[in-house]
Curated annotation (Swiss-Prot):
Belongs to the WD repeat CDC20/Fizzy family. Keywords: Acetylation, Cell cycle, Cell division, Cytoplasm, Disease variant, DNA damage, DNA repair, Epilepsy, Intellectual disability, Mitosis, Nucleus, Phosphoprotein, Repeat, Ubl conjugation, Ubl conjugation pathway, WD repeat. The lineage of its organism: Eukaryota, Metazoa, Chordata, Craniata, Vertebrata. GO terms for biological process: anaphase-promoting complex-dependent catabolic process; cell division; DNA repair; lens fiber cell differentiation; mitotic G2 DNA damage checkpoint signaling; negative regulation of cellular senescence; positive regulation of anaphase-promoting complex-dependent catabolic process; positive regulation of cell population proliferation. Acetylated. Deacetylated by SIRT2 at Lys-69 and Lys-159; deacetylation enhances the interaction of FZR1 with CDC27, leading to activation of anaphase promoting complex/cyclosome (APC/C). Residues 28-51, 64-88, 105-166 are annotated as: Disordered. Changing residue 47 to A: Inhibits APC/FZR1 E3 ubiquitin-protein ligase complex activity. This is Fizzy-related protein homolog. The modification N6-acetyllysine is found at residues 69, 159. Residues 32-42, 146-160 have a biased composition (Polar residues). The modification Phosphothreonine is found at residue 32.
């Protein structure tokens, strides 16, 4: 607000108060008995008009509005994916420029805007100060309007209105490919879909394992366990993408060479079905209904380098190694999430906040030690943990059974698949936990999830016997020009 205009406004208010004071005094005299010893003021007002010229308007504006909305409304307000949300942010920034002199030249992300407005340290100055500001605006500030300008707004607002709009991110709600998957089991505790680093998808259908090449769309049958009287309960690719592990209902783990279609070994040790597999270089971890986790090196003879991890009281249904290959997270039907390391046979961390089976587990590739987990039907929550300190971070109720979790390789986002009762796929932004997209199409629980090696597409499987491919994430392509590379002083950009 202009200081001269503010002074004139305050002067008018003071004059009006002084003009109305005699009337108030006369009314008090008529209502007060003559014998009353209390006398009313007759010359001085009873109000102090504060001068807000020295106040921090941005901080005051944030403090006034920070408690107006509920947390759910704040979460919806932060979701700026729609055009109406972006228009509202631009309009709010324009009002701040004209009324508060904020000097905003481009529309910021709502989360960034909240952090910018919120002071990092407590303000020592009061909200109302009774002194005039000594700061004077200089012509270089860009807030003064040119005398030749016909625009009713300031220069900063003009730059704000001329700033290009950030392109809206579009996530298709229709899968770009749908494949039939007959006999795909509708079992929450199994893991029957995995995508290799060589762009080959493995799917366990009944007693067989099929391989589908995303490059050629060719389908091959890797193995058939009907001869052995067994069925497939889990599949998992090695990091190199040349080996695939197959867990069976009888408790065996078979190692297959995908290119040659040859079984290399069969690992024993479990007494019940193997529903979870996790590779760590040449080591393979398997979780079973017998409540046991076995770690084995496939390069050594069977049972020679076996490690038995006992910590769950019911079936182990989720296994994931951290991105640095140092920690193993396991989830079970006992509602527990356990974290293991290489040197101990007992869990180094134990989380019991979930109220249902923990199958969905995912380690963040962007933040060291950040672990996400999801609970079953009775829990419906996605929880985040700092495994470096052992402390819980955040929690969000999704409203339905959490079946799978996967982090994006290119952005700080994650995707979750759900069962009862929504049967949907959700994309979340972290750490704000705002929904980026909601995908529907499966008629049964979305029990299976795998991500493509380039990190842009995902495949989901459900009991409706279909595999659906979605384009969810995209690689960030920088379009900024580095001025040092085109500088005249840079000799490497010129012909010598």
């Amino acid at each position: 607000m202009d200081q001269d205009y503010e002074r004139r406004l305050l002067r008018q208010i003071v004059i009006q108060n002084e003009n109305t004071m005699p009337r108030v005094t006369e009314m008090r005299r008529t209502l007060t008995p003559a014998s009353s010893p209390v006398s009313s003021p007759s010359k001085h007002g009873d109000r102090f008009i504060p001068s807000r010229a020295g106040a921090n308007w941005s901080v005051n504006f944030h403090r006034i509005n920070e408690n107006e909305k509920s947390p759910s409304q704040n979460r919806k307000a932060k979701d700026a994916t729609s055009d109406n949300g972006k228009d509202g942010l631009a309009y709010s920034a324009l009002l701040k420029n004209e009324l508060l002199g904020a000097g905003i030249e481009k529309v910021q992300d709502p989360q960034t805007e909240d952090r910018r407005l919120q002071p990092s340290t407590p303000e020592k100055k009061g909200l109302f100060t009774y002194s005039l500001s000594t700061k004077r605006s200089s012509p270089d500030d860009g807030n003064d309007v040119s005398p030749y300008s016909l625009s009713p707004v300031s220069n900063k607002s003009q730059k704000l209105l001329r700033s290009p709009r950030k392109p809206t991110r579009k996530i298709s709600k229709i899968p770009f490919k749908v494949l039939d998957a007959p006999e795909l089991q509708d079992d929450f505790y199994l893991n029957l879909v995995d995508w290799s680093s060589l762009n080959v998808l493995s799917v366990g259908l009944g007693t067989c394992v099929y391989l589908w090449s995303a490059c050629t769309s060719q389908v091959t049958r890797l193995c058939d366990l009907s001869v052995e009287g067994d069925s497939v309960t889990s599949v998992g690719w090695s990091e190199r993408g040349n080996l695939v592990a197959v867990g069976t209902h009888k408790g065996f783990v078979q190692i297959w060479d995908a290119a040659a279609g040859k079984k290399l070994s069969m690992l024993e040790g479990h007494t019940a079905r193997v529903g979870a597999l996790a590779w760590n270089a040449e080591q393979l971890s398997s979780g079973s209904r017998d409540r046991m986790i076995l770690q084995r090196d496939i390069r050594t003879p069977p049972l020679q380098s076996e490690r038995r991890l006992q910590g769950h009281r019911q079936e182990v249904c989720g296994l994931k190694w951290s991105t640095d290959h140092q920690l193993l997270a396991s989830g079970g039907n006992d509602n527990k999430l356990l974290v293991w390391n290489h040197s101990s046979l007992s869990p180094v961390q134990q989380y019991t906040e979930h109220l249902a089976a923990v199958k969905a587990i995912a380690w963040s590739p962007h933040q060291h030690g950040l672990l996400a987990s999801g609970g079953g039907t009775a829990d419906r929550c996605i929880r985040f943990w700092n495994t470096l300190t052992g402390q819980p971070l955040q929690c969000i109720d999704t409203g339905s059974q959490v079946c799978n979790l996967a982090w994006s390789k290119h952005a700080n986002e994650l995707v979750s698949t759900h069962g009862y009762s929504q049967n949907q796929i959700l994309v979340w932004k972290y750490p704000s936990l705002t929904q980026v997209a909601k995908l529907t199409g499966h008629s049964y629980r979305v029990l299976y999830l795998a991500m493509s090696p380039d990190g842009e597409a995902i495949v989901t499987g459900a009991g409706d016997e279909t595999l659906r491919f979605w384009n969810v994430f995209s690689k960030t392509r920088s379009t900024k020009v580095k001025w040092e590379s085109v500088s005249v002083l840079n000799l490497f950009t010129r012909i010598r």
